Amino acid sequence: MNILMITKEYPPHIYGGAGVHVDYLCRELERLSGAQHRLRVMCFGDQQGTGINFDVTGIAGMSELFCRKGANDKVVDVLGRNIVIAGLAEMADIVHCHTWYTFLAGCLVKQFLDIPLVITVHSLEPKRPWKREQIGTGYNVSSWLEKTAMENADGIIAVSQGMKKDILDVYQPDPEKIRVIYNGIDTVQYTKTLKPDILASYGIDPLKPYVLFVGRITRQKGIIHLVHALPYIESGVQIVLCAGAPDTEAIAHEMSVEVERARAGTSNDIIWIPEMVPVQRIVVLYSHAALFVCPSVYEPFGIINLEAMACGTPVVAAAVGGIPEVVVHGKTGSLVPFAPVSSVDPEPCRPEQYARNLAAAINELLAAPEKRQAMGAEARRRVEAHFGWEAIALQTLDYYEELRQERVHALKECRPYVDKKIPSFRA
């Protein structure tokens, strides 16, 4: 089988959970393929590479060719790259796309090559209204592209049961088209790794417990709510915020102001690491943490929680989206109740109470070191048992083959009409 994978993010240009997913899925598909399958990855960037049954082609930016600066140039750049990808695609038996950034290319390739289209849904645009702050009226385009892909896809992969429910609520596709295949984790790379010198390089005291956050500075990740919770956390701990890549200048400024306000309201050290930390160091930060906090207001799955759990660290997380399918309350961590403003506004309806609830859950685990240790061990066991990439890649290959066979059957059903002799209109 010739598999065409289309993605915005691909190593070394990865900034979010979707990129992590694609990276590991492609690695495992390549490893499993042998001589049976060939995988071609087309992505945004300058990546180029080839192997026996694998190659990658990056498509460079091109907004300057089509659009004046500032006039939806980011979205126009996306559309331009999609057109190029569709024009270069060839010899594929199935096309698999990730996120709205590649859905136009996927829809076009499906029509050009007459092959099944699979989309993996990592999030939904209507559930992320803050994207309008980031891309302006381009948000209308991203939402339209997502809706179009839902209508055109032969198969839809949801990364959690929560994500499947959201897809059905928002777009009402045929439920039979949706397959739930979880995200996974590399349990070799993400394992407990203790290196106190790395903590010291960030100004973290290795002898003092700390609470850890890792993520981008976005509305979705809920970091502002965690910052609001910091004054309510009991004294005697450190707070480590591994937070960079702000979506907008406005949220970057808000983050700076709120962190300074939190520092004035607590005796605990707040250590803010404002850049994206390399994986090797992130693993160390997870491993030494007393607990990890995921305050997201919208999280279809939450790979970040798997990363912490794989390193043997218990998790305090909002009970949103797919998180309860990963974090088992009372076993691998604590789930904090969450109520959104509405189905189209995922912010907490009572933000002050949410912040206090986060702090209460954090304080409860900080006060119980033996319980934290047991939860961390159970978290690692759960990750090993349920979230390995080999099983996820095999499920994906099986789904590809299922869709291919459906297409073959459909073509056979149509063949009698194709084979009928077309009458001549010559005299």
Q: How does the language model describe each region?
A:
Residues M1-G49, V408-A427:
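N-terminal subdomain of nucleotide-sugar transferases
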Residues G162, G184:
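Carbohydrate-associated surface elements
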Residues A252-M276, Q280:
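Nucleotide-activated donor-binding/catalytic signature segment of Leloir-type glycosyltransferases, i.e.
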Residues L291, P314-A317, V327, S334-L335:
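Short hydrophobic beta-strand element within catalytic cores of glycosyltransferases
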Residues V297:
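Aromatic "clamp/platform" in nucleotide-sugar-dependent glycosyltransferases that forms part
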Residues I185, Q238-V257, I271:
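Glycosyltransferase donor-sugar binding loop
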Residues V284-A289:
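Short alpha-helical donor nucleotide-sugar binding micro-motif in glycosyltransferases
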